[in-house]
UniProtKB/Swiss-Prot annotation:
Entry-linked InterPro entries: UDG_fam1, Ura-DNA_Glyclase_AS, Uracil-DNA_glycosylase-like, Uracil-DNA_glycosylase-like_sf
EC number(s) recorded for this UniProt protein: 3.2.2.27
Protein name: Uracil-DNA glycosylase
CDD domains recorded: UDG-F1-like
UniProt keyword Transit peptide, yes or no: no
Length: 219
């Protein structure tokens, strides 16, 4: 993990033995088999989006388990893959178009660089084994990231899609931050509350009202 302004708050909050256990878990799992994202991208979300620049937090579950797809950013998918994109990112693009934003590619790096923390609750996944690392090591870390963002004074938007992410609402101070909850953008649930929820325009309205610059979701 590269040193960022997330580093010290995390070390202050987590148990003293957490990071040695985390390093042991990473070393062991990456030696035993194919695990995604690449090891140097595990913490890419907090490396690309410092706490001081974080305006929006989108919570995902875990990385894509297919080779070459996971980038260390929730929902983001390499632009080099033009076909067979995950249905969730396709539905996110549909909602963007409905809200007047045009984003043709599925790489969300530019969002992260604007202050959108794309945080998976579980940061690694074995090949073709979705959610297999849930409950292993990551949740104490990612829950604390959410709490640190919530405790920060600058108003933020927390976007929680689906039952898994919505459970994180209890970690957030809703009196100063905007919490946007909706169905997950997967095909199973997108038509039951994700489409038409307008998370991107609502986010920008809140940011502008709180004196911050909006996100260019088209990037």
């Amino acid at each position: 993990m590269k040193k960022t302004d997330w580093s010290q708050p995390l070390r202050n909050r987590l148990a003293e033995d957490y990071f040695p256990k985390m390093i042991e878990f990473i070393n062991q799992t990456y030696q035993e088999g194919k695990v995604y994202p690449p090891e140097n991208q595990i913490f890419r979300a907090i490396e690309l989006t410092p706490l001081a620049q974080t305006k929006v937090i989108i919570v995902g579950q875990d990385p894509y388990p297919q080779p070459g797809k996971a980038q260390g950013l929730a929902f983001s998918y390499p632009a080099t893959f033009k076909v067979n994109r995950p249905d969730s990112i396709v539905n996110i693009q549909k909602e963007l178009r409905e809200e007047g934003f045009s984003k043709d590619d599925s790489d969300l790096t530019a969002w992260a660089e604007q202050g959108v923390l794309l945080l998976n609750a579980v940061l690694t996944v074995p090949e073709f084994a979705s959610n297999a690392h849930a409950g292993k090591i990551w949740e104490p870390l990612t829950d604390e990231i959410i709490k640190i963002a919530s405790d920060d004074e600058r108003p933020k938007v927390f976007i929680l899609w689906g039952g898994f992410a919505r459970k994180k609402a209890k970690l957030i101070d809703g009196s100063k931050h905007l919490i946007l909850e909706a169905a997950h953008p997967s095909p199973l649930s997108a038509s039951r509350g994700f489409f038409g929820s307008h998370p991107f325009s609502k986010t920008n309205e809140f940011l502008v009202e709180s004196g911050q610059s909006p996100i260019d979701w088209s990037k």
